[in-house]
A protein has these predicted regions:
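Mobile "lid/hinge" segments at catalytic clefts and subdomain interfaces of large enzymes
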Residues: 250-388, 498, 502-510, 542-550, ...
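Acidic, glycine-rich flexible loop/linker segments
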Residues: 623-638, 850-922
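N-terminal amphipathic, basic-rich helices that act as targeting or association modules
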Residues: 48-198, 346-353, 360-372, 376-379, ...
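Extracellular/luminal Protease-associated
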Residues: 339-346, 580, 802, 806-846
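Long, structured ligand/cofactor-binding scaffold of large enzymes
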Residues: 102-306, 317-320, 423-426, 445-541, ...
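Terminal amphipathic helices with adjacent charged low-complexity linkers/tails
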Residues: 132, 157-202, 345-453, 617-676, ...
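Long, charge-dense accessory insertions within large macromolecular proteins
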Residues: 599, 652-798
C-alpha cells in the first residue's frame, strides 16, 4: 500500500511539474497533461485494503468488455449469514462496507449477521460497527483547521520520535474553497470581479497554506476559489455513485461511493444514491488517517412519496414540507430513505434538494436509491459512459436498484402525497417553521407580536433616500446555496420570473440587497444559454460569486444608511434566501427574521420589498404604465420551465465547465508555496497558528476521573446551534476576537469573518459562545456572549473562562433540547474544550456535535427522569460534581450533585453520552486525534 501511495504521489508531483515548467516551451503540453486527469491516475495507483472475506462473497461483474470484482450481498445471504433481501438500500451500502472490510478484528462475521438481525427485529439492532467511507470532502472554513491539525500532528509525531510522512490521508480528500467569498459589491456587472479581488486580499494567507497542504500531503486536492460550492461540485462532478479502486493484490474492485464531509450538508449527494454525511473536522481527520468511524447500526425511517407536484409549486416547497414533517416525527441519529411511486415523478435535482436538508430535519441522511433517474442524471452531468454502465449493472446485480418491486423493511414510515404541496416559505428562525405562502403575512405579523414583541407600522427615515424603513421590509434577497442553485428547474424558474418582471418595467425595491451566487459555473452557462442572466441583472440579481455567501452569513454589509435606520428604530428587518438555514444571527447582524424560499420566490419578494404582504394574492408592484402586477402575472408555467431546462442544461456544459476544475484562475496559479514536509508556522500570522492540542504530547494516557466542584459557564436554552456556539460571520472590534486582532494591528476592515480565521485558535477561542443573539440564562435581558465571572460580575465568556482557568476551576455548561444543532463545525467543540469546559449537560444532543465534543475530550451528559435546567431551578451560581466516571461504560447512567448557593444539594442522575467503547479510548487519550497520533507513533 505504501509503495502505491508513493508512486501515486510521485506521478502527481511529476504531472504538476510538467504543467508548470513546460508552459514556456510548448503551450500544448499543459493541456495534454490535464487530459490525463489526476483523479484517474490516483485511482490507478491508490489501493483499497480489503478484508479476508471469510464467507467468500467476492464475485466478478462483467460490464461491456471489462470484468471487475465486487462484494456480493446475495452471496453473503447464500453463505448463510442471514436474510438481507429486504434491507433498505441505504443500509445495504453499510452492509457492503462490512463485507469488503471483514478482517476478524475491526469487522467480524457477527457484525455482518447483525444486519440480518436488524431486519428480523423490525429495523432495530443498535450494534456498534466500524465503518470506512471511501473518501472525504471539505470546504475551506472547516478544511483550513483540519489541515492545521494535520500539520500540527506532523509536528507532534516528530516529537514522539515518528516519521512526519505517517501523517498522510489514506483516502482521497477533496477540499473546495467556497466559504470565503463575501458580498461586498452587488447589483452591478463588476460585482463578481470585485468580490473575487477582495476575497484574495483577505484570504491569501489561508490560500497559501491550503496550497502548501496540497503539495505536502498525499491524496489531497484543492478546488480553487471561484469554482463552486463543495456539495454542488461533489454532486455534479466528484461523486461516481459506484467507486472503483485497486485492492492490495492489484485487482480492480467496485463498491458504493461513500464519503464523510466536514460540512453538515454533505448529505446532498444522497440524491444521487451516494451515502455521505457531515462530521466534524476532527472525525474527518481521523477517517483520512485510516481510523474507521465508530457508529451504531442505525434505524431507517422510510418516507413514502406518492403523486406529483402541482402547477405553480417547486422542489423547494416540497423540501420545506418534508423538513417540517420529519422534525415533528423525530429522526435525529437515524437514516431516512425515500421510496414510493412518487419518485418516478421526482427529478434528481429535487431529490438532491431534499437530501441536502437532512441536517435541518435532523437525520444522519436522506437517501434515494439508484433508479432510472439516477442513471439519466449521471449521463446528463458528463460522467464517463463506462462508469454510468457500471453503476446500473452493479446496482441491479447487488440489490441496490429501485423498481416497482422495491419493498424494504423500515423501522418506521411516513407518507406524503406530493399533490398536496403548496407554495411556501419557512421562518423566521428555524428551517422547520413551514408557512404556506398564503399565510405568510399573517404568520409574520403573529411573529412580530409573539416572538419579537415589536409593533408594526413604525417608520424610520433613511438618510439621503425618499423611502422609509419599517419592520417587515426585505433588506436581503439572495439566490444562494447549493440547496437550490443545483436545481435547474428553480434556477430557470427564477430567471423566467425576472424576465417577465423586467418586461413589465419592474425592478427590485431600492432597499433590497440582491445577489445571485450559484454553486457551480454550470449554472451561469445555462442561464447565459437561456439568455436569462440579462433578465436577472435587470432586476438586480447580478452574479456576485461562486460560493456559499448569504447562506452562511457572508451576505456582506448593508448600505450604512439602511443599517442605521434599522438600529435607530429597533426594527425587525427581514431576509429571504434560497438557502437551507435561517437561524437567528446567521444571515446578517442587521436582520432578525430570515425566511427560506425557492429562487423564484426570492425574486418575487425582492420585487415586493416586504414580508408584510400576502404574496399569493396581493399586488406586488406596478408595471411601467402604473398597472398593478400580481405574482400570477410573472410566474412561469411548469411546461415553460421544463422546456427551457431541456434546451439549455446540457451534458456538454458540464463537461466544459469541469474540464479544468483544479486549475484555478491566474491569482490561484500565482500562489507560491514551499515543498517542506512540516509547516513553517509564521509567527505573525493572524490566520494560521500552531494549535496547542499536541504541544508537549507524550505516549501516556489518562483514565477518566470524576468531575469535582465545577462551576457553571452558561445556562442555555433549546435549539442552541453550532452557530450560537461558534459563529461563522463577521464581528466587531469591541468583541474579544476583535480586540485580539486590533492589538496585532489588524484593522476592522480586515477582520474578515470568524469562519475564515478558524486556523487561528486564539481568535476562535475568543469567538466561542460569542453569537450576538445567544442568550445565557444566567443573565436577565442580556444577549450575546456574556456570563458571570469568578467575582460575580458580568463579563465576556472568554474572559471569565480564562479567569477560571487561572484558578484551576473546571467548567460545565447546561443546555436544553437539540443542543448543538446545525452545522458540523468542529470549532463549536474545539472552542468549548479550550475554554476549559469539561462537561456539557443537556436534555438532548444533535448527532454531529455530540460526536465532536467526545472527539475533543469533552463529555456530553443528558438529564434523566424528567429533570431539566428549569425544573432544577438553576441560575448559574451552583457547583457541580459528577461521580462514577472511573470505569464508566458507554451510555451508563451516573450520579451527580448540584450544590446550590445556599449550601443545599440536589442529587440527580445523568446519562453519559459516550456512546461506544472506542469513544472511551478517545476521552482517555484527550481526544480522537491524540488517540490516532499515539497509535501512528506506536506503529512507526
Amino acid at each position: 500500500t505504501g509503495q502505491s501511495l508513493n508512486r501515486a504521489r510521485m506521478l502527481q508531483k511529476l504531472l504538476f511539474g510538467i504543467q508548470m515548467y513546460a508552459k514556456p516551451l510548448d503551450p500544448q503540453v499543459p493541456q495534454l497533461i490535464r487530459g490525463l486527469n489526476i483523479l484517474s491516475i490516483l485511482e490507478i495507483f491508490m489501493t483499497v485494503v480489503v478484508g479476508q472475506d471469510t464467507a467468500k462473497t467476492r464475485r466478478t461483474l462483467t460490464v461491456g468488455s471489462k470484468s471487475i470484482a465486487y462484494y456480493s450481498i446475495p452471496a453473503a445471504q447464500a453463505a448463510g449469514l442471514g436474510d438481507f433481501s429486504r434491507l433498505p438500500a441505504a443500509l445495504k451500502v453499510v452492509l457492503e462496507n462490512m463485507l469488503r472490510f471483514e478482517d476478524g478484528k475491526t469487522v467480524s462475521v457477527d457484525d455482518i449477521k447483525a444486519f440480518a438481525e436488524w431486519g428480523a427485529k423490525g429495523g432495530k439492532n443498535p450494534r456498534e460497527i466500524a465503518y470506512r467511507p471511501a473518501r472525504v470532502l471539505m470546504q475551506d472554513f472547516t478544511g483550513v483547521p483540519a489541515v492545521v491539525d494535520l500539520a500540527a500532528m506532523r509536528d507532534g509525531i516528530v516529537a514522539l520520535g515518528g516519521d512526519p510522512e505517517k501523517i498522510n490521508p489514506l483516502n482521497p480528500v477533496d477540499l473546495v474553497i467556497d466559504h470565503s467569498v463575501m458580498i461586498d459589491e452587488f447589483g452591478t456587472p463588476r460585482a463578481f470581479q470585485m468580490n473575487v479581488d477582495r476575497e484574495y486580499e483577505r484570504n491569501m494567507e489561508r490560500y497559501t497554506f491550503l496550497k502548501w497542504g496540497q503539495s505536502a500531503f498525499n491524496n489531497f486536492r484543492v478546488v480553487p476559489p471561484g469554482t463552486g460550492i463543495c456539495h454542488q461540485v461533489n454532486l455534479e462532478y466528484l461523486s461516481q455513485t459506484v467507486w472503483t479502486d485497486q485492492d492490495q493484490n492489484g485487482q480492480e474492485v467496485a463498491y458504493p461511493d461513500t464519503l464523510v464531509g466536514t460540512d453538515s450538508h454533505t448529505t446532498m449527494v444522497k440524491g444521487a444514491a451516494v451515502l455521505g454525511w457531515g462530521v466534524g473536522g476532527i472525525e474527518a481527520e481521523a477517517a483520512m488517517l485510516g481510523q474507521p468511524i465508530s457508529m451504531l447500526i442505525p434505524e431507517v425511517v422510510g418516507f413514502e412519496l406518492t403523486g406529483a407536484m402541482m402547477e405553480g409549486t417547486t422542489g423547494t416547497d416540497l423540501v420545506l414540507k418534508v423538513v417540517e414533517m420529519l422534525r415533528a416525527r423525530g429522526v435525529v441519529g437515524k437514516f431516512v430513505e425515500f421510496y414510493g411511486t412518487g419518485l418516478d415523478n421526482l427529478p434528481l435535482a429535487d431529490r438532491a434538494t431534499i437530501a441536502n436538508m437532512a441536517p435541518e430535519y435532523g437525520a444522519t441522511c436522506g437517501f434515494f436509491p439508484i433508479d432510472d433517474e439516477t442513471i439519466r442524471y449521471l449521463h446528463a452531468t458528463g460522467r464517463d459512459e463506462d462508469r454510468v454502465a457500471l453503476v446500473e449493472a452493479y446496482a441491479k446485480e447487488n440489490g441496490f436498484w429501485r423498481d416497482e418491486t422495491y419493498a424494504p423493511i423500515y423501522t418506521d414510515t411516513l407518507h406524503l402525497d406530493m399533490g398536496t404541496i403548496v407554495p411556501a416559505i419557512s421562518g423566521p428562525k428555524r428551517p422547520q417553521d413551514f408557512v404556506a405562502l398564503t399565510e405568510g403575512q399573517n404568520a409574520f405579523r403573529r411573529e412580530m407580536e409573539e416572538t419579537f414583541k415589536r409593533p408594526m407600522g413604525k417608520q424610520i427615515a433613511v438618510a439621503g433616500e425618499e423611502y422609509t424603513m419599517e419592520s417587515g421590509k426585505v433588506v436581503i434577497a439572495s439566490i444562494t446555496s447549493c440547496t437550490n442553485t443545483s436545481n435547474p428547474y428553480v434556477m430557470i424558474g427564477a430567471g423566467l420570473v425576472a424576465r417577465k418582471a423586467a418586461a413589465l418595467g419592474m425592478d427590485s425595491k431600492p432597499w433590497v440587497k440582491t445577489s445571485l451566487a450559484p454553486g457551480s459555473q454550470v449554472v451561469s452557462a445555462y442561464l447565459e444559454a437561456a439568455d436569462l442572466q440579462k433578465d436577472l441583472d435587470a432586476v438586480g440579481f447580478n452574479l456576485v460569486g461562486y460560493g456559499c455567501t448569504t447562506c452562511i452569513g457572508n451576505s456582506g454589509p448593508l448600505q450604512p444608511e439602511i443599517s442605521a435606520a434599522i438600529s435607530e428604530g429597533d426594527l425587525v428587518a427581514t431576509a429571504v434566501l434560497s438557502g437551507n438555514r435561517n437561524f437567528e444571527g446567521r444571515i446578517s447582524p442587521d436582520v432578525r427574521a430570515n425566511y427560506l424560499a425557492s429562487p423564484p420566490l426570492v425574486v418575487a419578494y425582492a420585487l415586493a420589498g416586504t414580508l408584510d404582504i400576502n404574496l399569493a394574492t396581493d399586488v406586488i408592484g406596478q408595471d411601467r404604465d402604473g398597472n398593478d402586477v400580481y405574482l400570477k402575472d410573472i410566474w412561469p408555467t411548469t411546461q415553460e420551465v421544463a422546456e427551457m431546462v431541456e434546451a439549455t442544461v446540457t451534458r456538454e456544459a458540464f463537461l466544459s465547465k469541469y474540464a479544468d476544475v483544479f486549475k484555478g484562475d491566474e491569482k490561484w496559479q500565482a500562489v507560491d508555496v514551499t515543498n517542506q514536509k512540516t509547516y513553517d508556522w509564521p509567527a505573525g500570522s493572524t490566520y494560521v497558528q500552531n494549535p496547542p492540542y499536541f504541544q508537549g504530547i507524550t505516549m501516556e494516557t489518562h483514565k477518566i476521573t470524576d468531575l469535582e466542584d465545577a462551576k457553571v459557564m452558561a445556562i442555555l436554552g433549546d435549539m442552541i446551534t453550532t452557530d450560537h456556539i461558534s459563529p461563522a460571520g463577521s464581528f466587531k472590534d469591541t468583541t474579544p476576537a476583535g480586540k485580539y486582532l486590533t492589538e496585532r494591528q489588524v484593522s476592522p476592515r480586515e477582520f474578515n469573518s470568524y469562519g475564515s480565521r478558524r486556523g487561528n485558535h486564539e481568535v476562535m477561542m475568543r469567538g466561542t459562545f460569542a453569537n450576538i443573539r445567544i442568550k445565557n440564562e444566567m443573565l436577565d435581558g442580556v444577549e450575546g456572549g456574556y456570563t458571570l465571572g469568578p467575582d460575580g460580575s458580568q463579563m465576556a465568556i472568554f474572559d471569565a473562562a480564562m479567569a477560571y482557568q487561572e484558578q484551576g476551576t473546571p467548567l460545565v455548561i447546561f443546555g436544553g433540547e437539540q443542543y448543538g444543532a446545525g452545522s458540523s463545525r468542529d470549532w463549536a467543540a474545539k472552542g468549548t474544550a479550550l475554554l476549559g469546559v469539561k462537561a456539557v449537560i443537556a436534555e438532548s444532543f444533535e448527532r454531529i456535535h455530540r460526536s465532536n465534543l467526545v472527539g475533543m475530550g469533552v463529555i456530553p451528559f443528558e438529564f434523566t427522569g424528567g429533570d431539566t435546567r428549569k425544573s432544577l431551578g438553576l441560575n448559574g451560581d451552583e457547583t457541580v460534581s459528577i461521580r462514577g466516571l472511573e470505569g464508566v461504560k458507554p451510555l451508563q447512567e451516573v450520579p451527580a450533585e448540584i450544590t446550590m448557593s445556599d449550601g443545599s444539594v440536589k442529587s440527580i442522575t445523568l446519562k453519559c453520552r459516550i456512546d461506544t467503547e472506542v469513544e472511551i479510548d478517545y476521552i482517555e487519550n484527550g481526544g480522537v486525534l491524540h488517540y490516532v497520533l499515539r497509535n501512528l507513533a506506536k506503529a512507526a
